[in-house]
A protein has these predicted regions:
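Long recognition/docking surfaces used for binding and targeting
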Residues: 1-74
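A glycine-/small-polar-enriched, mobile loop at the entrance of the PLP active site in fold-type I
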Residues: 77-78
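Conserved S-adenosyl-L-methionine
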Residues: 82-191
Length: 191
């Protein structure tokens, strides 16, 4: 009985921590975090249990993309009449484009943000080439971070006509470590 009570208290404490983090996110971006979490403390414990061993910083772009698309379900199966460019084609196009940290990138029909993410990843890879010791050297880390983060913040833009998919793109950008502030909901053809 005391074990059950201890578990309930742990679940409740975890629930409160998750809710506080969510509210913190909501203060930063009300559009992305506008829905309330409707999970019980037990279900949150289960989700956290699955995710706690996952390090998104060390997970490659394709794996994160597949996981995100699976998690988001019907958005990415064309149930809303949109067509999502296959990851291999997105990667090919971004690879052949001369995207640098000072390039401006605009995707007028950004969908889930695939082109934006691959462009960001390309610039981040270039930063890693320029600052190979960024993980150990604080000065290099600051330069490495500034190199790709400035690109994400100032040069990377997405427009998506569907408000729900625009929010999904922002979430996808957050999962991939920033750049979500320049994704807007609008008609990219007329804007």
């Amino acid at each position: 009985k005391s074990e059950t009570k201890r578990r309930l208290i742990e679940n409740d404490n975890l629930y409160k921590r998750v809710m506080a983090l969510y509210e913190e996110g909501r203060k930063k971006d009300k559009e992305v975090f506008r829905d309330n979490i409707r999970l019980t403390p037990e279900k949150i414990r289960t989700v956290v249990g699955y995710l706690e061993s996952v390090n998104l910083g060390e997970t490659d772009l394709d794996s994160k993309g597949r996981a995100f698309e699976t998690f988001m379900g019907s958005f990415f199966r064309g149930n809303f009449g949109q067509y999502f460019t296959p990851r291999e084609i997105v990667k090919f196009i971004v690879d052949v484009l001369p995207i640098e940290h000072d390039s401006k990138v605009l995707d007028t029909s950004c969908g889930s943000g695939g082109f934006l993410l691959y462009a960001l990843n390309k610039v981040r890879s270039k930063a890693t080439e320029l600052y190979p010791n960024y993980a150990k050297d604080v000065r290099q880390h600051d330069r490495w971070f500034k190199y790709w983060h400035d690109f994400a913040e100032k040069n990377l833009y997405g427009i998506e006509i569907s408000e729900q998919i625009s929010r999904a793109a922002k979430m996808n950008m957050i999962i991939h470590d920033d750049g979500h502030t320049n994704v807007i909901t609008s008609n990219g053809i007329w804007s």
